[in-house]
UniProtKB/Swiss-Prot annotation:
Disulfide bonds listed in the record: C1-C15, C2-C11, C6-C14
Protein name as it appears in the record: Conotoxin reg3g
Molecular function in Gene Ontology: toxin activity
Keyword field contains Secreted: yes
Transmembrane regions listed in the UniProt entry: none
Domain notes: The cysteine framework is III (CC-C-C-CC).
The UniProt record lists the keyword rRNA processing: no
Modified residues (Cysteine amide): C15
Subcellular location field: Secreted
Similarity annotation: Belongs to the conotoxin M superfamily.
Cellular compartments per GO CC: extracellular region
Tissue spec: Expressed by the venom duct.
């Protein structure tokens, strides 16, 4: 993937 939006609980792929 290009990028990832990450928090303490989860990482959501952002493509």
């Amino acid at each position: 993937c290009c990028m990832a939006l990450c928090s303490r609980y989860h990482c959501l792929p952002c493509c």
